[in-house]
Amino acid sequence: MKIDLNCDLGEGFGAWSMGDDAAMMRIATSVNVACGFHAGDPDIMHKTVAMAKAHGVAIGAHPGFRDLHGFGRRPVPGITAAEIENLVAYQIGALQAVASLAGHKVTHVKAHGALSNVACQDDMTARAIAAAIKAVDPKLIFVVLANSKLVDAGEAAGLAMVHEVFADRAYEDDGNLVSRRKPGAVLHDPAVIAERVLRMAQDGAVVSMTGKVIKMRTDTVCIHGDTAGAVDIARGVRTALEANGITVAPFARS
């Protein structure tokens, strides 16, 4: 069995940084790079891509709503499908250009924050993201939340997909992520998270906040770089997987 560990990195801006990207880069096998709208800037993007290349880590675009102040975690009411297509294509293109400069290659796309959360439950948003990816490069892999509207959109667009589960986030009974506004939405105990991810990988299932077992295809596991204790969490997850004979490797080769 093989599984990928992905992490959202490059989420600083100017002199401000978030998380320990250097440490996470040594543990993750794929990283999703902020493209300047919710976080990131040209210098941080280049530094992140160059670091990924040096560690043999695959890179993907991590487009979000244009909301630096809110870190892309606030919905944008009234946004149109065309506007979503434009902002996603713009951000993918930005990372592709920076990656070319750094001698690396973008292999996948994963929507960030509110853009992803809305798309998981809204057909229009999900299809707009998929349409933008297909228009920019139909060979890009679409990272989708398992069992969500993103899966349907990716299938309709004919995109290759990787199904994602989250190590450090709680799930609702319908398979969607618990809102960060709710208590218990973000998990922090490395031992609990490692055991949880091992079950996800072995059983192809997650357990919701109420204890419901939800079957989910598990190709890649996300660990948020901005979660408190992220490095310890990531290290614990990788150690648990490998100790149980599961190969940790990128889903794409750049």
From Swiss-Prot:
Which GO MF term does the entry hold, naming one? ATP binding
Keyword NADP tagged:
no
Superkingdom, taxonomy of origin: Bacteria
Spell out the SUPFAM superfamilies in the cross-references: Glycoside hydrolase/deacetylase
Catalysed reaction, written as an equation? 5-oxo-L-proline + ATP + 2 H2O = L-glutamate + ADP + phosphate + H(+)
GO BP terms, alphabetized: carbohydrate metabolic process
Q: What class of enzyme is it?
A: hydrolase
Q: Name one Pfam family in it.
A: LamB_YcsF
Record-annotated disulphide pairs: none
Keyword list (alphabetical) reads: ATP-binding, Hydrolase, Nucleotide-binding
Q: What Enzyme Commission number does this protein have? A: 3.5.2.9
- Function per UniProt: Catalyzes the cleavage of 5-oxoproline to form L-glutamate coupled to the hydrolysis of ATP to ADP and inorganic phosphate.
HAMAP family membership: PxpA
Q: How does it assemble?
A: Forms a complex composed of PxpA, PxpB and PxpC.
Q: Which family does it belong to?
A: Belongs to the LamB/PxpA family.
What is this protein's name?
A: 5-oxoprolinase subunit A
